[in-house]
Amino acid sequence: MLLNDARQQIADACSHLSDDGLVVGTAGNLSVREGDLVAITPSGLPYQEMRPDLVAVVEYATGKQVEGPLKPASELDLHLTALRATGQMSVVHTHSLSLIHI
């Protein structure tokens, strides 16, 4: 399996975000870049169901999926653009309930 550590980090982060009530269901995505590959949460899978083997892996340059049984997050282009523009190694995009409460 490609990017084992990155996929495990994403699964762990999804669990923490869900357990801490920071996300609900499938709201948001996480990605981690290692070299010329990016691990990213799959589309439509609730955070509490995330496992490393379900995390999608895509090419950093093209976004083409190279591993994972599920489609990458629908916001893949947003993640790739953010990674390229900032030079950072990861992106966390959530729809946190605490950000919309008044």
Role assignments for model-derived ranges:
Residues I100-I102:
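Conserved small/polar residues in nucleotide/adenosyl-binding loops
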Residues L2-M89:
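An anion-binding catalytic pocket shared by soluble metabolic enzymes
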